[in-house]
Amino acid sequence: MTDRRKPSAHPARGTSGAPTPKRRLHLVILVRSFGFPHGMANTNRVRLLGRALAQRDVEVTVLCSRVSEKPGSVRNTRVRGVADGISFRYTAGTTVRPDSFIWRRIREARGYVGTLLALAHLKAASKLDCVYLWSGAMSWQVGPWLLVRYLNTLRVPVIVELNERPWAPPAWPRVIAKRLSFLDGVSGVVAISSWLAEWAAGEARRLGRQVSILNLPIVVDVAESAPSDGPHADQTLVYAASPGYDAALAFILTAMQEVWRRHPECKLIVTGGDRAPSRVPADSTRDDPGPSDERVIRVGYVDRDSLLHLFAQASALLIPLFDDDRSRARFPSKIGEYLAAARPVVTTRVGEIERFLQDGETAYVANPGAAAEYAHKIIEVLDDPAAATAVGRAGLTVAMSTFHYSLYGAKLRKFVESLSESRQ
């Protein structure tokens, strides 16, 4: 979960001395499938990018077109407000999902119409320079597609967030496939990885469209973390699981068989996720330890302060990626939070990892899919805590110099401004 904190500048560089552009921009960040200001990775990225823009004299408004909360586990209670200098509003009139199927459809319709009216009102008031749309790229959806058409009629440039592998359209006639493309009607793309930036460039060429592309990696507020000092006596590994990524946990459990042979007291803490994996892959040498082995501790979802504390106290932080397009496209935000905790990160050589991290220097990096090699990287950490601490500290330096959110405020503002001026 994210929480609202006092905005921080980069701990090493700051932003107070930077010149502020004169023209005030107005940006709407439109989200559909997650809440604000509290939530998970997407919420945190919206919060940090919005904060970076607010520090650059951009008036940012977040419109949530759908409810985000389930009854009994409500994190976002306010329908409108201000968080970190970012205005937000739930256009459905509530944050909580109704129990009734009919009322859910009514709330969804109200949120959609409310979004259209809010955008029209902002446009009429000359307070809508650009819309930054977060609609998800893994499947085609009629709602976002129609929304882009609507914004085109208002002559408002649309930026789309691209942080996952896009869907592949069926083998339909070219004219239909072009109209259903993720980029149809879009002016700009913010891509979280170079793989996605290259995909967007290729898709724009296929469509014959002029689409501006900004490769903006994961962002983190390094001031949120409180790194601990020195090596840790307790051997504790932490894996922050994401929904839909059971294979990663199964891979880790396979690797832990080898780790436990050398370090039988080592514990694995798993946060978040969907559920325990149904099985450990076939190359495991023992039964699935997930539900029964006391060394595997599943804590579920925890509040953000507790999560960051777990990161800071861990012997190592785990995040394996796989040799497939899904992993090559994504760049998990938790990597930035791991690095900011100044604890050693154990990952695999896929996608953006090779761009930003060096094995044995700023992280421990194994080849993808090799559970035994991944286990040996974990063992390296546990065998030499002092060296692992040095690697963790070097990783923090990477987070500060490369991923701190305020580093990207000027670049993102310039991107928004250029698209806005192109429509004037």
Which residues make up each language-model segment?
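Membrane-proximal helix-turn-helix segments that form the acceptor-binding/catalytic region
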Residues: 47-51, 113-120, 142, 146-154, ...
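Short hydrophobic beta-strand element within catalytic cores of glycosyltransferases
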Residues: 319, 337-347, 364
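Nucleotide-activated donor-binding/catalytic signature segment of Leloir-type glycosyltransferases, i.e.
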Residues: 272, 280-309
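Conserved donor-binding/catalytic core segment of Leloir-type glycosyltransferases
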Residues: 28, 190, 220, 228-257, ...
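Acidic donor-binding loop of glycosyltransferase active sites
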Residues: 311-328, 343
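A short, well-ordered alpha-helix in the C-terminal region of glycosyltransferases
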Residues: 380, 387-402
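A short, active-site helix/loop in glycosyltransferases that binds the activated sugar's phosphate group
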Residues: 168, 182-211, 222, 279-283
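Conserved acidic donor-binding segment of nucleotide-sugar-dependent glycosyltransferases
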Residues: 359-371, 380-386
